[in-house]
Amino acid sequence: MKTYTCKNIRNIALAGHGGSGKTSVCEGLLYKCGEIERMGKVSDGNSVMDYDPEEIKRKISLGTSLAYCQWKDVKINILDTPGQFDFAAGLYEGISAAESVVIALPAKDGVQVGTIKAYREAVKRGKATMFVVTRMEEENSNFYKCLEELKTEFGPSICPIVVPFDKYGTVESYINLLEMKAYTYDNGVPTEVEMPASENRLKGLRAAMAEAVAETDEELMMRFFENEGEDFTEAELIKGLHDGIHKGYITPVVCCSGDTLAGIDMMLNTIIYMLPSPDETDGELCEDGTRSVYGSKDTLEAKVFKTVADPFVGKLSFVKIVNGTLAAGTEVINRTTGNLEKPGKLLSMQGKKTDDMIEAYAGDIVAVTKLNANTGDTLTASGDETIFAREKYPVPCFFKAISAKDKNDEGKVSNAIKRMVEEDKTLSYDHNHETHQRILGGLGEQHLDAAIAKMKNKFGIDVNVSDPVIAYRESIRKNVQAEGKHKKQSGGHGQYGHVKIEFEPCESETLVFEEKVFGGSVPKNYFPAVEKGLQESTAHGVLAGYPVVNLKATLLDGSYHPVDSSEQAFKMAAHIAYKQGLAQASPCLLEPICLVKVVLDDASTGDIMTVINKRRGTVLGMNPSEEEKGMTELDAQIPQAEITDLATVIRQITRGLGYFTAQFDHYEQLPQALEADVIANAPKYSEYEG
């Protein structure tokens, strides 16, 4: 396969709301460039980009897919990203590896939440942005309504490049505002036709484009205003648009139909002439805050931005080359781990199909076999100590407990999940040793459902799914004194231990043990046995068997037998006193309270606060979000038992814009009205046997 240098490469991430036509546009781009012989459809399950069995089944993209096309001696690497919010890892991967983000929105639906989220993520990372209005062939498509919505939502940077001329809801031709020419299409082949009569609207759009271009250059600005809106040449417009897009001043808008190929050629021209090549950007951010400019040195620097785990083929690493040359079989250093690695094959991806490559240059994206690298790792040549900054992914906020349906698969579950977490950085896995549950975390119900289905399809493991057990605690609310006597006679040698202990609440999470024994009623050599008996007893409370915290025990008195007393007997006596004492000390249940940070739009604040109050939460405060421009951060404390489905609720209220993170903060007393239900559903445990 032909190799390309930085200047002749464009890396674009296709993003947008779920169902916005991204994958269909990608099919159109590949077909128009001659990379595929026939166009597939998401609905038919035969598109180039959606090839995973779960994607075909669900008819949505679950992860980032990579393909390429070649147009006028420029290679365009296309990263098709998921539009569903549960699969945001794919969006982050795609944007991190691209210089430009092309955001699709359907002509019928206009700006949606996914449109806004994709734009915000692109701008946050300093990427060039472009909008493509899709599905222009559909009935009731309305490009100009979409254009007004884009201007309202994203401001004056919006600049149409290709617009339709429609009549009675049907597109009759596509207008290239750079050329001021109109085209009709037959299977993607353009034919120039006479410009439509609506000249005033088109002249207004052209003048707005010229003004936007004028603002990118002082000389052009002077000419524009001195000559009362003087128009520019096509070359000046292209250069001005290119510069403005790179600086973030201009966001171009084109329109097309992925299915009929109308306007696809003009979209391709916009990509190669106006979007930046890798070497025109500020470069890749390094861990130390500096940037490595694409194509600025000969030594290899590359980053792994995506990993695919396959039980048969092994690991496939998607790599973006920043500098130098990556060659198959040539040793590299993994700067993240410090290990020497030898790449296997270099592959140029066309969905699931591959072409072998001997080498690839700065700015290009390839897949590599036999790398023991993870997503976010940096690969360099010997002597180059560059380490690239790692992408920050959304934190899991939806959790389920899983267990193998076939007990023989129990040992395989952890290994399978480990492979999946390598592949998807928004999945998490934890083995909770207290509740003895394997906890799988993700971004939502659909996310975990797809992960569990993948576990079955890829690794052959079927699992049971349940809600995680809440790790409650028990404590006491008043001081009591209790006695425990363990006396047992069997044959010659008996057992005897007798203690009197005071139990009281305290602030310490672990047991506080003291002794105030006078006169030797309990010999000192048995004090450790009493303490150990109490320590072991606190593993289970008297209400529901949960661990006991905030407990102080003071050994006051007791008695012993010179022959029958032993450490074991005093341990048992302490346990008896513990059970009797705690039952009389007004025992209570404590529930875990989480510190929750909700990021939301201002319009949803009232509804979210109502939800928090209904879930026994307390709002601590609100501030403008530092990371999400135009959003608000709301801090609250909410019981862990009340946040099980909070991710779904927040997403519904905020229309997908909002999200939350939670971390354990402290324990609080469970309201008495809820105790009976918790006790009834508490997991069973084995009684202390000494």
Where do the language-model regions lie?
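Structural and coupling elements of P-loop NTPases
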Residues: 1-690
